[in-house]
Amino acid sequence: MAAGNEWEVTEWDRELFQRELESFVPERIFDAHAHVYRVQDFAAGQAPAFVAAGPAVAGVAEVERRLQELIPDRPMEGLYFPYPHRSMNTAAANEFLGQELQHRPGSRGQLLITPEMSPEDIHNAVRRWGFVGLKCYHVYAARERTFEATIEEYLPESQVRVADELGLSITLHMVRATALADVANQQTIRRYCSSYPRMRLILAHAARGFNPHHTVLGIDS
């Protein structure tokens, strides 16, 4: 996509897709990590630059339309959740997501959670909208440098317990400098998964494997 305009699909993008991905991407697509948003759900003037540069409302149909510009003629569904941000009205964002999925039986949604949400809040939202999982994010940790947050700081055990009770998935975008190679991350992932076997933990972005060396170091843990 063109520098300075992440929302514009260029001929370079299309050529890259044809060269590298056309033979790999299946005829039917399920996007397992897709965000939706409304600008109105962010505090005034606080929407991140990527969101501010895009449409005022990016729901499921808009996401599909944009992807079809790059990947035409392939039916698409997905696992959707709101765009996490500290200024986000999470209740409004979750309601928007729930409404978006009412007429998309092939797609699923995850509830955007903050550490302050009670088990009852989660139960009620999941029951109301039929969400299949939870989406936590480090920006909701109660510290200034949230990239150093432990998993427990933005995914407390009480919420993992609810996911286990309801058989929900959790999408975890872990942080800390070495990601999967971080001992604290390893210990928490093992403890949560062994203690709550009905909870399915999705380690987002290939276990945040942006540095392959960290993934190699931590994958056997």
Summary of predicted features, one role per range:
Residues A2-S158, V162:
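Mid-domain alpha/beta scaffold segments of enzyme catalytic cores
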